[in-house]
Amino acid sequence: MAELKTGRGAIDLPTEVSSEIIQKTQESSSVMQLSRSITLPGRGITIPVIAGDPEPAWVNETEKKKVADPQLSTKKMTAYKMAVIVPFSMEFRRDNSALYNALVNRLPLKLAELFDATVFGKVEKPGENFDQLSAATAYDISKNTYDGLVAADTAIAVAGYASNGYVISPQGKGILLGAKDTTGRPLFINSVAEGAVPMILGTTTMQTKGAYVAKGASTPEIVGAVGDWTQAVVGSVSGIQVSVSDQATLDTSAGTINLWQQNMFAVRAEIELGFRCNTEAFARLANGTAA
């Protein structure tokens, strides 16, 4: 059971509440849903990366059998701490259930958005042992959306992998909704009433704000990605650490909050996560080019 420590005693955060926060974070993160998941020890772990598959061969009864020679390498996966501080009014201190509900409703989405944004390269990575999809090749889907998607999928196949998941941003969704065939019918939605993009080229599609990366001086505007998500691993250190204080001063974008003076308290939540992937198994989807 996680504990909310204060200067005036302690409030217990039930295990089921902590578990629900973690579960909803995973459900809110497209990257977490598509990637393989492992439990990560605090000191990190070395994981094997297979860069090529073993190739079998037909042989006659007495001939030598082919010896598989897959290309193997390793990567160090490190747990990096993600933290957020959320201020509350004192009325939540009088009602623990209201506090728990507020935590469950407010924390997961923000944690998930930051994680996805970091994986896509919108946010600077926390350390060298955290991979980002910004290393993957980008394919323009702005002018001929269908051909751009096929080019990205083909590149992944040529590299020896199989696409099994698209992640698009709201901006990418707009491009897909605007793609039409020669008769003017939408290509990527079942009906105009749905307004969603459930699948692309027969592959599962998910949406997250974190998949959008604004155009840079030498990089295109990124609106999504596609890849073989068996080549991506999310590691998490069990549990979410939560503590509370009513004697602190918070620096926010809007100014300074003195918790004691303003009759408030703040909850700090921390979780440790890691991410590793084989970027050759992924392609980014761009709205235009870098030029």
Task: Name these PLM-found stretches.
Residues 51, 90, 271-275:
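Beta-strand elements of well-folded, non-transmembrane domains
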Residues 40-41, 138-265, 269-271, 291:
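Extended oligomerization regions of viral-like shell subunits
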Residues 34-37, 94, 274-276:
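Short beta-strands and strand-coil junctions in structured, solvent-facing domains, enriched
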Residues 2-82, 149-150, 281-282:
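Assembly/oligomerization interface modules of large self-assembling protein complexes
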Residues 55-58, 95-96, 175-178, 185, ...:
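Short helix/loop capping segments that flank catalytic or ligand/cofactor-binding pockets
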Residues 47, 107, 267:
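A residue-level signal for conserved active-site and pocket-lining positions in enzyme catalytic cores
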Residues 61-65, 101-104, 182-183, 220, ...:
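Short intrinsically disordered coil segments
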Residues 73-76, 81-161, 206, 284-285, ...:
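Alpha-helical scaffold segments that mediate packing/assembly in large oligomeric complexes
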